[in-house]
From Swiss-Prot:
It catalyses: L-seryl-[protein] + ATP = O-phospho-L-seryl-[protein] + ADP + H(+); L-threonyl-[protein] + ATP = O-phospho-L-threonyl-[protein] + ADP + H(+). Its EC number is 2.7.11.1. It comes from Plasmodium falciparum (isolate 3D7). A motif (J domain autoinhibitory motif) lies at residues 400-408. Ca(2+) 2 binds at residues 473, 475, 477, 484. The active site is at 245 (proton acceptor). Activated by calcium. Upon calcium binding to the EF-hand domains, the C-terminus of the junction domain (J domain) undergoes a conformational change which results in the dissociation of the pseudo-substrate inhibitory motif from the catalytic domain. This, in turn, may facilitate the autophosphorylation of the activation loop at Thr-285, which leads to the kinase activation. Residues 425-460, 462-495, 496-531, 534-568 form the EF-hand domain. Residues 125-379 form the Protein kinase domain. One of its GO terms (molecular function) is ATP binding. It is a peripheral membrane protein. ATP binds at residues 131-139, 154. Ca(2+) 4 binds at residues 547, 549, 551, 558. This is Calcium-dependent protein kinase 5.
């Protein structure tokens, strides 16, 4: 067995309770054979090959000596570029196509994450106090010099990167995420020596620390945690993304309040795998790893196993598969046998035990999936404790939807960019409202889910409400993402802040010359268009909506007046 210490952790147990963090070992199989059942090793070498879905192997990404991430082919090909097909000799604005009423605002968010040419030191004041330490570098706290918002920055030393492909995949996966319980990646910076990932700040500590502090949780407290974990998994699995290293150390509390939400972090082992496809690389952490991973053939239900282990620990304070060392732990995982044999389990309901058993089903093909988990009777009995949408909130939200519907397309995009950058304090109760609307827990809203909560059984009113909700669905797929929902519900006082507006303006001003041109607007809007692009006439009309001095551009003063509602 080859051990690779990924984080500064050690092992020490007393009376069956976890007392300190265990040493993490990564798994690798050189040639993935059925005989390598308990082999742990460093998964950095050739990671791009062994971690890809066995039916979805793709070409390796290209490297660059200095800007290995942001200038690599995979990221250049993924920048804003418009979806219509235009030859290099043509003016893209002369390529007239029918206008679609839909454009995907969430797609813009995914792209602006990697569109940063500033120096990190020009944008952030770095606090040298370390929030965490990993094999590649440190995580520190930082404050935006422009907005005052606090962030966490993961500083990665390039010389310590053994597998560039894994890091690229981590970033590409993270920038697709838009869920209340998945940590946000805001920006990526890079210089010759380091890579900087600007992340949502979560300073409430690890779930692991809470387990050490309290020992075990009541069923209701465990329910609140597991509901958030499974909702995040539902969202990921629907995108054919698996985390593969779920554990209490990778679950953070946003703050120190009693009802602080949690965020799932560390997507370094995450991978894509299509339905009915299997992966074969062996990665994970001994206590939480699924037995089928050790056998070298598994799918996204490996995350369900890990979640079942977490739920088990929450309810009793110790792991279902324990041992003096990693070898002993893995042998027990391979057998998949566990019991509810202590006094702790006497007070735990049969429903909770049944759900754990279904999550820890040894045969992963028969294991419960995340949709079935959230329909389990254990979850249903706590559902009545969720936020109840009252009539006052109904009226407020509907008014917000009306206001949002009246906004021009540019402002809708700008508001969406602003919504993505907000922290928990700015979002307020909207997060709980989103979760209350999300009946099936998949991390996105359907028009039907919102309509059922807000309708008043008045035909005329309900028709108007349904129409407004259709407008929130900007890409026409019937789903409303978390950031799209926040953007439609935000208090407009947020837009009065100059620094907030300036940041939104910079998203559109691609070359930083102080004005938004037709070409820049075309690049942004055509990228977010669904199936078709925008004609030259449409782009010109959008500019005219904001261009008060008719010079053909949108300067910052015009943009600010649009955002704040100030009229000439």
């Amino acid at each position: 067995m080859k051990e690779t210490e990924v984080e500064d952790m050690d092992t020490n147990r007393k009376d069956g309770k976890i007392k300190k963090k265990e040493k993490i070992v990564n798994m690798k199989n050189e040639e993935v054979k059925s005989t390598t059942k308990s082999t742990l090793a460093d998964s950095d070498e050739d990671y791009s090959i062994i971690t890809l879905c066995t039916k979805c192997l793709s070409k390796k990404l290209e490297d660059n000596k200095n800007r290995i991430i942001l200038d690599s082919k995979a990221f250049k090909d993924n920048r804003l570029k418009g979806r219509c097909s235009v030859s290099s000799n043509e003016d893209p604005l002369d390529n007239k196509l029918n206008l679609s009423p839909y454009f995907d605002r969430s797609q813009i968010i995914q792209e602006i994450i990697l569109m940063n040419n500033d120096e990190l030191s020009d944008v952030y004041e770095i606090d040298r106090y370390k929030l965490g330490k990993g094999s590649y570098g440190n995580v520190v706290k930082a404050v935006s010099k422009r907005t005052g918002q606090q962030r966490a920055i993961k500083i990665i030393e390039k010389k310590k990167i053994h597998n560039i492909e894994r890091l690229k995949r981590e970033i590409l996966i993270m920038k697709q995420m838009d869920h209340p319980n998945i940590i946000k990646l805001y920006e990526v910076y890079e210089d010759n020596e380091k890579l900087y990932l600007v992340l949502e700040l979560c300073d409430g500590g690890e779930l692991f620390d809470k387990i050490v502090k309290y020992g075990s949780f009541s069923e209701y407290e465990a329910y609140k945690i597991m509901k958030q974990i499974f909702s995040a998994l539902y969202y990921c699995h629907s995108k054919n993304i698996m985390h593969r290293d779920l554990k209490p150390e990778n679950i953070l509390y946003v703050d120190n309040t009693e009802d602080s939400p949690i965020q799932i972090i560390d997507w370094g082992f995450a991978s894509k795998c299509m339905n009915n496809h299997n992966l074969k690389s062996v990665v994970g952490t001994p206590y939480y790893i699924a037995p089928e991973i050790l056998r070298g053939k598994y799918d996204k239900r490996c995350d369900i196993w890990s979640s079942g282990v977490i739920m088990y620990i929450l309810l009793c304070g110790y792991p279902p598969f324990n041992g003096k060392n990693n070898d002993e732990i893995l042998k027990k995982v391979e057998k998949g046998e566990f019991v509810f044999d202590s006094n702790y389990w006497a007070r735990v309901s049969d429903d909770a035990k049944d759900l754990i058993c279904q999550c820890l089903n040894y045969n992963y093909k028969e294991r419960i999936d995340v949709e079935q988990v959230l329909k389990h009777r254990w979850f249903k009995k706590f559902k009545s404790n969720n936020l109840i949408i009252n009539k006052t909130l109904n009226k407020t939200l509907i008014e917000k939807f009306k206001e949002f519907h009246k906004l021009c397309k540019i402002k809708k995009l700008a508001v969406t960019c602003i919504a993505y950058q907000l922290n928990e304090k700015d979002i307020g109760k909207l997060k709980k409202t989103f979760e209350a609307f999300d009946h099936n827990g998949d991390g996105v809203l359907t028009i039907s889910e919102i309509f059922q909560c807000l309708k008043v059984n008045d035909n005329e009113f309900d028709r108007e409400l349904y129409f407004l909700l259709k407008q929130l669905d900007t890409d026409g797929n019937g789903l409303i993402d978390y950031t799209e929902f926040l953007a439609a519900c935000l208090d407009h006082s947020i837009f009065q802040q100059d620094v907030i507006c300036r940041n939104a303006f910079n998203v559109f001003d691609l070359d930083g010359d102080g004005v938004i041109t037709k070409d820049e607007l075309f690049k942004i809007l055509s990228f977010s268009a669904v199936q078709v692009s925008f004609s030259k006439e449409i782009i010109e009309n959008l500019i005219k909506e904001v261009d008060s001095n008719n010079d053909g551009f949108i300067d910052y003063d015009e943009f600010y007046k649009m955002m704040t509602g100030v009229k000439e």
